[in-house]
Amino acid sequence: MKVVFNIVLIVVVFAFLHHVFPLIQVIGDSMYPTYLDGEIIVGTKLYRKSKLKKGDVVLYQSPTDDKTVIKRIDQIEKRGGVLYFYCLGDNPPHSYDSRNYGFVSSKNFVCKVINQRRNINDVCNQKRRNS
């Protein structure tokens, strides 16, 4: 019985951590060279939108379609008690962002990026490309 309890506890803790600290796979080159296509990054849902600042990287629902996108905050405005963010990709020629659709409501935000985990092969390949 104790083994079953421990297994259930592990599953519950893992599910909680995965919900609060989601692992996100970067798709596309809009955040290159900061984040590479296919790279895994860690987000957090434990943050205050009022504490977000210029330079923070966030994940949000695009205001133009159902895609979830990762971008860097460039400007912040408060209108009628709601925060709006102007978010840009780090690679402008490959980024569909606030330059195309304007400010994004904080209501669209999914999480804040807190860390990245790079595959060692990607790091080595990146260094070779830059040499």
Residue ranges of model-derived segments:
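Extended hydrophobic leader/signal-anchor segments used for secretion and membrane insertion
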Residues: 1-131
